[in-house]
Amino acid sequence: NDYSNVSISVKSKDGNSDINYEFPKDKHHLIPIYGLYADYNNTVVISSEGVDKVINIKTDKLPDDFVYVDSMESGNFRFYNGNYPYAIDSNDEVRWYLNGNYYGDILVLDNSNIVIGSDKYTEDGNTISFYEMNFLGKIYHEYLLPNGYYGVNALYNDNILILSDKLMLIDLQTGELIEEYIKNDDYNYICPIEDDIIVGKDDLYSRVTDG
């Protein structure tokens, strides 16, 4: 039996924020390594069928124009999008970023891919689509929105809510429009709660009833 699974552990500086992920059994593995610190000699443990191999990966520093957003939010792994999309760990250390001028919120899917606005912009500064991609930037799907994508999204019943000129529900598998709700009134927040959807801007919130 030549099938084997592989697990990766990127060791943290403090010993409490390792990044671990696994790959299912297969004959051949092409293993991406993400979760590395910038400008650091990272320790990575690759494990398969009870055998561990330790490697070291030295990384470059962050780009000179990298903008770091200070945040008071808590959590083990938080995503932001400044002039680069990036993620930080519980110690506010950057552990992942993408090259490219992508737009809007970063949403992590159950398959460990992300949803993010594309790097294709209209003259008024809105992007015309959003991507499903992996953490290395490989694009699997592009969803076109003729009236623009405003960078706000949320998962809803295994589909995705997005803000274009209206609040829309889109099938992530097919890209088809499932439903349109209210007109976008400069909203910058979506939060599904059971069968309702909360949209908001600034400190004002509205409830949208599905159906």
Predicted features along the sequence, with ranges:
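Short proline/glycine- and polar residue-rich coil/turn motifs
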Residues: 23-27
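Surface-exposed loop/edge segments in extracytoplasmic proteins
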Residues: 14-22, 94-96, 140
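Conserved aromatic beta-strand anchor motif in extracellular beta-sandwich/beta-rich domains
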Residues: 8-12
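Histidine-/acidic-rich catalytic cores in large beta-rich domains
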Residues: 3-7, 29-30, 34, 41, ...
